[in-house]
């Protein structure tokens, strides 16, 4: 009892101990915590918690900086582009299949045509027109404005038109006129279609060969003298941006020397259906051909050129009319 009382007396006399608050800081070996600073400590994530993802805008910025496409981004082929590619494949396949029996027909007729209609070759033109109209019918519509301005089929004239697309020739065949057009030499080597161009008597040219150009112009004058109309694309080649470039004087010097009329033609829509350089795509749409009034014969080729270009430009939207002095580059 004496021992217990002494312990109780000691407990009463003991001074109170002040308890210091302890920080919930994990102990780490080799690191001494600062006693006077209270910093928030990171909380370890729960294994079941999902990591927070940055916003998509941040992903877009990082992906753009790194040039890495995002899933579902615009770098993936768009459905309309895929559809345009499928349409182009179908168009060329259909056109080629149509050309097979028609080419055989042209081969059979060739001896008679050369014997009795060497220059105009009207029978071959009839086959060409049939082929072109049947090729385009399932894919786009061609509307002709100013058909009353077309001269008779047997009248020798110079047709001039703006050049936007591979489809220009297909579309112009809808005019049902037996014109000869000028095309680069390599096109005549295309199986079936190029051979058909040769049988029809179209004119080949190497645009970077001066002698070939002079020979082409002389051949056009000979055709006009024999009563065959001729079609020129005075820009010289297709426009990459659909803007009409300056006209070269070759077609108008031929018309001036032959003393024939010049018929300006405006093509609308072919460049949007199948742009130059994108022949692997065929977009939906329609083509409009505007036939302007014929320009009377004129011995001044420069005046004919200016008047024809103004007529063609009059039916084009202003944004598709380029500078008259800006010439398209020559190509082989």
Curated annotation (Swiss-Prot):
Coiled coil: none annotated. It is found in: Membrane. Its EC number is 2.3.1.51. The keyword Lipid biosynthesis applies. Pfam families: Acyltransferase (PF01553). It is a multi-pass membrane protein. Keywords: Acyltransferase, Lipid biosynthesis, Lipid metabolism, Membrane, Phospholipid biosynthesis, Phospholipid metabolism, Transferase, Transmembrane, Transmembrane helix. InterPro entries: AGP_acyltrans, Plipid/glycerol_acylTrfase. Pathway: Phospholipid metabolism; CDP-diacylglycerol biosynthesis; CDP-diacylglycerol from sn-glycerol 3-phosphate: step 2/3. A motif (HXXXXD motif) lies at residues 163-168. Disulfide bonds: none annotated. GO terms for biological process: CDP-diacylglycerol biosynthetic process. It catalyses: a 1-acyl-sn-glycero-3-phosphate + an acyl-CoA = a 1,2-diacyl-sn-glycero-3-phosphate + CoA. It comes from the Eukaryota. The chain crosses the membrane at residues 96-116, 185-205. A motif (EGTR motif) lies at residues 235-238. The keyword Transmembrane applies. GO terms for cellular component: membrane. The HXXXXD motif is essential for acyltransferase activity and may constitute the binding site for the phosphate moiety of the glycerol-3-phosphate. Converts lysophosphatidic acid (LPA) into phosphatidic acid by incorporating an acyl moiety at the sn-2 position of the glycerol backbone. Belongs to the 1-acyl-sn-glycerol-3-phosphate acyltransferase family. This is 1-acyl-sn-glycerol-3-phosphate acyltransferase CHLREDRAFT_174358.
């Amino acid at each position: 009892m004496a021992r217990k009382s002494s312990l109780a007396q000691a407990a009463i006399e003991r001074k109170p101990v002040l308890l210091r608050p302890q920080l919930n800081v994990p102990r780490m070996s080799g690191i001494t915590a600062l006693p006077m600073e209270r910093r928030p400590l990171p909380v370890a994530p729960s294994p079941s918690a999902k990591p927070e993802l940055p916003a998509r805008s941040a992903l877009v910025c990082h992906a753009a900086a790194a040039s890495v496409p995002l899933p579902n981004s615009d770098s993936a082929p768009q459905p309309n582009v895929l559809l345009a590619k499928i349409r182009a494949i179908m168009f060329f396949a259909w056109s080629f299949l149509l050309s097979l029996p028609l080419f055989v027909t042209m081969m059979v007729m060739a001896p008679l045509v050369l014997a009795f209609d060497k220059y105009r070759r009207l029978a071959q033109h009839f086959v060409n027109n049939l082929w072109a109209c049947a090729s385009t019918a399932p894919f786009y519509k061609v509307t002709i404005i100013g058909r009353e301005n077309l001269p008779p089929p047997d009248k020798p004239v110079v047709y001039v038109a703006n050049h936007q697309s591979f489809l220009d020739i297909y579309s112009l065949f809808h005019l049902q006129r037996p014109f000869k057009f000028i095309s680069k030499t390599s096109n005549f080597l295309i199986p079936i279609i190029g051979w058909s161009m040769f049988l029809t008597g179209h004119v080949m040219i190497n645009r970077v060969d001066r002698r070939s150009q002079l020979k082409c112009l002389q051949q056009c004058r000979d055709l006009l003298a024999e009563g065959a109309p001729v079609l020129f694309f005075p820009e010289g080649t297709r426009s990459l941006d659909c803007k009409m470039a300056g006209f070269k004087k070759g077609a108008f010097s031929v018309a001036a020397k032959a003393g024939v009329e010049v018929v300006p033609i405006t093509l609308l829509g072919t460049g949007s259906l199948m742009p130059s350089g994108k022949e692997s795509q065929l977009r939906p749409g329609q083509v409009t051909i505007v036939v302007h009034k014929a320009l009377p014969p004129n011995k001044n080729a420069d005046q004919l050129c200016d008047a024809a270009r103004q007529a063609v430009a009059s039916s084009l939207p202003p944004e598709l009319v380029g500078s008259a002095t800006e010439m398209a580059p020559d190509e082989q």
